[in-house]
Amino acid sequence: MNVNQSVPPVPPFGQPQPIYPGYHQSSYGGQSGSTAPAIPYGAYNGPVPGYQQTPPQGMSRAPPSSGAPPASTAQAPCGQAAYGQFGQGDVQNGPSSTVQMQRLPGSQPFGSPLAPVGNQPPVLQPYGPPPTSAQVATQLSGMQISGAVAPAPPSSGLGFGPPTSLASASGSFPNSGLYGSYPQGQAPPLSQAQGHPGIQTPQRSAPSQASSFTPPASGGPRLPSMTGPLLPGQSFGGPSVSQPNHVSSPPQALPPGTQMTGPLGPLPPMHSPQQPGYQPQQNGSFGPARGPQSNYGGPYPAAPTFGSQPGPPQPLPPKRLDPDAIPSPIQVIEDDRNNRGTEPFVTGVRGQVPPLVTTNFLVKDQGNASPRYIRCTSYNIPCTSDMAKQAQVPLAAVIKPLARLPPEEASPYVVDHGESGPLRCNRCKAYMCPFMQFIEGGRRFQCCFCSCINDVPPQYFQHLDHTGKRVDAYDRPELSLGSYEFLATVDYCKNNKFPSPPAFIFMIDVSYNAIRTGLVRLLCEELKSLLDFLPREGGAEESAIRVGFVTYNKVLHFYNVKSSLAQPQMMVVSDVADMFVPLLDGFLVNVNESRAVITSLLDQIPEMFADTRETETVFVPVIQAGMEALKAAECAGKLFLFHTSLPIAEAPGKLKNRDDRKLINTDKEKTLFQPQTGAYQTLAKECVAQGCCVDLFLFPNQYVDVATLSVVPQLTGGSVYKYASFQVENDQERFLSDLRRDVQKVVGFDAVMRVRTSTGIRAVDFFGAFYMSNTTDVELAGLDGDKTVTVEFKHDDRLNEESGALLQCALLYTSCAGQRRLRIHNLALNCCTQLADLYRNCETDTLINYMAKFAYRGVLNSPVKAVRDTLITQCAQILACYRKNCASPSSAGQLILPECMKLLPVYLNCVLKSDVLQPGAEVTTDDRAYVRQLVTSMDVTETNVFFYPRLLPLTKSPVESTTEPPAVRASEERLSNGDIYLLENGLNLFLWVGASVQQGVVQSLFSVSSFSQITSGLSVLPVLDNPLSKKVRGLIDSLRAQRSRYMKLTVVKQEDKMEMLFKHFLVEDKSLSGGASYVDFLCHMHKEIRQLLS
């Protein structure tokens, strides 16, 4: 049966499912359960997968017609100059035509000379039919590269002017800290009415394979290859990768008058014969083919010589490589949105690469888990370990088990098998899924993971149809969907006892610092109303979660808020060395029953400690107290800790100030990321055993040792929020918004996750915020919809190309109502014997997510320099393997990138320049530790915008336009001093105002008459009744709604001292900390590749 031919039956189970009203939505999936029935799952909304009789039953491969056409002599071989994804559009986002620019001479291993290559003229191609040879020759004659001034391009191309050089940032940041104390914008409190917080999971289209000079179905022309010789008398000897800043030191300039001369390389042939050893491959994604790679060749820019000695003086200075002639992230993102943002992504085809995370798309579940739950670095896995080692592409999956879905998508269905529980394989314990193969008339099933034959219980038996599929397959979510939930039996519960509903305990620092800043009063006022919005399940009128309160400085104060009391009672525990809970009855209470007593307590706390002079605090005993309270109540739960200073009081977990910037760039730098004492890891282990998750809100005025304090939240599945130099007037909205969201979001407690794989691969490494007591089980005291677990796989046997590879993620957790559940996600991947299929089906955003987490964990045990070198080497090996095995023969002067990895260099450079791996002088040790633990559990969407921020021009699109303005590349070159730009990276939000912006725009946005009157550092825009003001404020609200944390606004004026902070996020430019520009890093990467190939 063809996968695209089946007609779905009528949905038999379209009834509403249990749902959860939490933060912004009433279920894990984000759909509003109170007003509308559950949306039928994907199998009923489109073609059903045609399960065939050969295993795996669930996902069949697509028919040959859906694959890419096999390579032929009429096609451009991989690596050949052809059209790419550079569409005709805004010039500031990259070339729209195949413009050739110069680059630095190719590198030489050990400085050996390189023979000059032949002449290769540039090609300028517009859209349209393929040009004739005569047309090409005409276009070539109109452009020259090596002269000082290039003539205008021919009329058939785009008429953009000569390239400008990349500007490098200079100056210094203000002392306020990168992630701390900028003024805060105002935003309304979160409410249920706001709906789902605008998760935009954008998509990516797979570009089509195309013949030489033939435009594909979509996308713009591709860059031609470019080659060039070394400068006379110059060798390309650069620093080894082991030097501290790969290309981070400022490049040495050539002597005045140096000129790049020599002929350009030969034009690649229009049609190249199939190279030996490279077999024609069908596209492994069984969708649109992911076409040939882009070529970027030619001489490197002359400025970055990477430490080589200047050659003899030459006449004119050379032009540097045009930034517009290299791959543009913005263009790739826009192309994917245009090509894949209009149609739903149907998960019925095995190994299908999903749209990019930057594309907004809908998902129809037809047997594989949605990419919102699982994204892989590659959807086509090498069949052998030798092939995987050769390619060096990490095989990993980023799993977000409780991901929130947009309202248009249904939450996973809940399946109840009663006392018998979910059906599993007897040998490997995998759960029933669409890939299981039923045999012997339905009386047995063969496990798709371990091939064990299992009996089908009588109560689960059903007959098979003529294709070998059960006739009730579409009545059962576990037989037709990629994601679903089982209600767990008592066998899945601790001590064979069903759990109690969880509890929230608020633990408030009442030392001098917390009182002085107004934090305690602000928090107590907010909690009065916030307790009405605790997460609840289904149609429940009130939350089942109980609450408790503790305040502390050097000692701890517990509060009895039993509903029968007229006033709350305080009990003080001063023996912090041996912590215990002084009361059980009345500590954890139902909010509605004890509302009057709780309100009275929250009114009294700020007054009781108003005159305190106690500056010392404890930390470990506070968490111990919360954990003991949960243990006494026999329930799981979450601690909300509000803490202001380094815990220096005499108590377990006492810390000293060890901040030492002199350790940066030394072998001891790793100690700055390690906890000071083992007491915190021991405490975290105890918390996980109890199901006690910790969320930490920090309000430091100075060093607090985030690396140590964040250990417990990190290992328990919690979160850390940091508000440096907290001031109520500037930071209240950000803190309250984060707090509301954190309290309201749905959480799974006391969770255990296991990832099973089919024979041939296994999970070997895990990254994220969790604890592992063995090598297979990920233990999480708490897991919310923002957290991910990244899993790396390795081969332990040969894979079969026909049967593919399977993953199953099973999460056992306790819901907010105390119900024990199993959430299952399944994914089928293709397997390949050709490297070209691997490179054609990679996902660069997921690859960068994995590489960043790998590096950020590496700094705990290795010098930062070694970690950075490892990343550079791995990237070079990935691209060199592609060049050697998949690209058509071409000059060594060409840089050839795989089509779906052409953004790998720019994104990897952003990771290398990040504050954790290459800090500027203004980045504090706490900031680095904070960002390190944040990235560890980020999903692919978050790492994408964190490492490559979005830069949006505000005055170029019509004021009446309701769509988001098109982004521009993150470089100072792209800024116009007559415009205003918004920049966001998921944590920070800047509004940059050009010095020449029109007076009317200034008046409309800031209600002042001139640029000079704008207040730099402003954190709230005035609310003005005009279209531009409404549009900008609406856009800011929209961006904030898309992110998991509130982004505070900072207004930055051009040439103001705050501008250096803004320029830190223009990641295509050189950084103040010595990080390379995108252009320079691409040149350096080319040098590394050539060294590997030679």
Swiss-Prot record:
GO molecular function annotation: SNARE binding; zinc ion binding
InterPro entries xref list: ADF-H/Gelsolin-like_dom_sf, Gelsolin-like_dom, Gelsolin-like_dom_sf, Sec23/24_helical_dom, Sec23/24_helical_dom_sf, Sec23/24_trunk_dom, Sec23_24_beta_S, SEC23_SEC24_subfamily
A single GO cellular-component term on record: COPII vesicle coat
List of residues binding Zn(2+): 425, 428, 447, 450
Any Pfam family: Sec23_BS
Region named Disordered: 1-338
Keywords carried by this UniProt record: Cytoplasm, Cytoplasmic vesicle, Endoplasmic reticulum, ER-Golgi transport, Membrane, Metal-binding, Phosphoprotein, Protein transport, Transport, Zinc
Biased composition (Low complexity): 20-29, 60-77, 273-282
Quaternary structure and partners: COPII is composed of at least five proteins: the Sec23/24 complex, the Sec13/31 complex and Sar1. Interacts with TMED2 and TMED10. Interacts with GOSR2 (via IxM motif) and STX5 (via IxM motif); recruits GOSR2 and STX5 into COPII-coated vesicles. Interacts with DDHD1. Interacts with STING1; promoting STING1 translocation to the COPII vesicles.
Protein name as catalogued: Protein transport protein Sec24C
Species this chain originates from: Homo sapiens
Lineage: Eukaryota, Metazoa, Chordata, Craniata, Vertebrata
